Amino acid sequence: MSEKKYKWHKVADSLGEVEFAVNNIAVVDLDGKKICLGKFNDALFAFAFKCPHAGGMLAEGFIDALGNIVCPLHRYKYSMANGRNVSGEGYYLKHWPVEIKEEGVFVGIEEMGGLFGWLK
């Protein structure tokens, strides 16, 4: 299996520019779409703005003591590391890698390649 390739999108000039709420979640713009950034310990994660279960705004949720994103509507929990639902319902939260560079904060969106690469 080949290594994933990402196109990196700048979401902030610096980490200090990102306005994290008390719950350690911030909403940022990624090419005209809202996504969330979450901080847990020393790690930074990017994930979808809405819960895949019922569309709850995850920025209004919280990060639990284990580093899971908790939806404010029905308390569904998702791993920030891999997007998997950890409360057993089988939903999957879109998530993306984050890199902090001298030029700013970047979120990586996987590039499509191989058989379906022509669909870009």
Where are these regions (language model features)?
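N-terminal pre-ligand scaffold of iron-sulfur
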Residues: 1-64, 97-120
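A short, compositionally biased
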Residues: 20-24, 73, 92
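Short cysteine clusters
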Residues: 51, 71-74
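Short linker/helix segments within small regulatory modules
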Residues: 61-68, 86-92
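Generic recognition of long tandem-repeat/solenoid scaffolds
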Residues: 67-71, 85, 105-109
